[in-house]
Amino acid sequence: MRTVLHALPAFSAGSSRQLRSLHFGLGHSGRKAYIQASLHADEVPAMLVAQHLKKRLEALEAEGLIEGEIVLVPMANPIGLAQDQQGSLFGRFDLTTGINFNRQYRHLTAALIPLVEPLLGADEAANTQIIRTASMRLLDGWQPTTEADSLKKLLQTLAMDADIVLDLHCDTQAVLHVYAGTPLVAQTMPLAAYLGAQALLVSKASGDDPFDESVSRIWWELAEHFAGRFPIANACFSSTVELRGEIEVDHALAAQDAQALINYLTHAGHIGGPVAPLPEALCAATPLEGVEPLTAPQAGILVFFKAPGDAVTAGEAIGEVIDPLTDQATLLIASVSGTLFARVSRRYVTRQMRVAKIAGSVAFRTGNLLSM
């Protein structure tokens, strides 16, 4: 294992931060998988899974079973990890800018088209390398003006040339679920099956440029743009993995999830040895555009009738909100049928606050599809 410490530019006198990446196998070998944990710094289950992954990858490297290079960033957000305010860790948003750490990465497609068009040809593998080189060139030219953007540039650069990118997160209260690009469904199904995911949410563009799409979306967009002229592969499979709820920090679960990720990487050819049998998938892929985010109709005490993982039928109440001043109770009614895969942990809510998400099978939403 090779450890690399990446210094972030100092934006305040007398302070410095760094990011640690762990490199297993052979770098610059032509094969690369990249895994990062806790980009939202308060999503601790991902960090524990990374600890278990590190031990497993060290053992596999000692056995000579790493095919190519696997890069692990066991804690992807030193900025957010330091944002402890009066006993609460604010790891989702940069307190300086108010921007989500998993939004506003560089969407490179438009800038790539004029760069690569004169260079592309009939060789798909050569085209992949041309596009990766040009992408790195564009990222190198990014001049961040905030500390958070410096971190985003570093993370996107580390992942940009990878064949597989896995971004490990968690929700507040949730079952394990997975996000991926619609063109990547076939590659995502084995990952979801090994992990035991209960929802797989797919979209070609979820909005606001999250990390996982910043490294994969260019491939299907360039393939569409140059269709009939140049062959372009979906050369990067990326996915966001939500490792249940935020308090599910447990060694048994973390070891289970780490093994599932090892099984997936073996299945994908990035780790040698026998391939674990593929479990039966617990869910089908459903459109992110079909997710219903239920909002509180009034402020008050939130009482759920349904738990994460429960099936919900359109027209069914999943909970109620009780106004403590008027005693008025208002039901939360689902308008779609599907799986309730996530809900908030707060039990006093404000009007129009998002409180739960249901994975429906029929697309009906447009625009920015992710939570803030």
Regions found by a protein language model. Name each.
Residues 1-372:
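Structured catalytic-domain cores with a bias toward divalent-metal coordination
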